[in-house]
Structures are given as structure tokens and as C-alpha cells.
Amino acid sequence: MPGVYLDDNEYNFDIALRRFKKQVEKAGVLSEMKKRQHFEKPSVMRKKKKAAARKRLLKKMRKANMG
């Protein structure tokens, strides 16, 4: 779990909040929360994963053909 500790000479809340937000984003807490907000059947998860892989492949192929 991300956490921010303040130094003795650090009293600025905005800086601490910014550091905390950065740590939360880096840890992927919000995206994980959104993903787990509703139950998703394993078959739907597999379909989404397969579709994302196909999309990445097509994007990679388009990029290779263009440049």
C-alpha cells in the first residue's frame, strides 16, 4: 500500500499529496479498483485479453508497414 512520510522540515501538504498520487498511480491501485468494481466472468476476461492482443498485433503491423 502506497504511503508518504513527511520529513520534520516538510510541512507542505500539496507536495506530499502529489507524491502520494504518483505512488498510487505507479502501483496501479485505481486501475485495479476499477477492474474489480464489478465481477467479470473468466470467459469475458479471456475474450478481452485476446481482443487486446489482436489489437496490439494489428497496430504493430500497421506501424511496420508505414515506416
Curated annotation (Swiss-Prot):
The keyword Membrane does not apply. GO terms for cellular component: ribonucleoprotein complex; ribosome. Coiled coil: none annotated. GO terms for molecular function: structural constituent of ribosome. GO terms for biological process: translation. Keywords: Ribonucleoprotein, Ribosomal protein. InterPro entries: Ribosomal_bS21, Ribosomal_bS21_CS, Ribosomal_bS21_sf. PROSITE patterns: RIBOSOMAL_S21. Belongs to the bacterial ribosomal protein bS21 family. NCBIfam families: S21p (TIGR00030). This is Small ribosomal subunit protein bS21. It comes from Oleidesulfovibrio alaskensis (strain ATCC BAA-1058 / DSM 17464 / G20) (Desulfovibrio alaskensis).
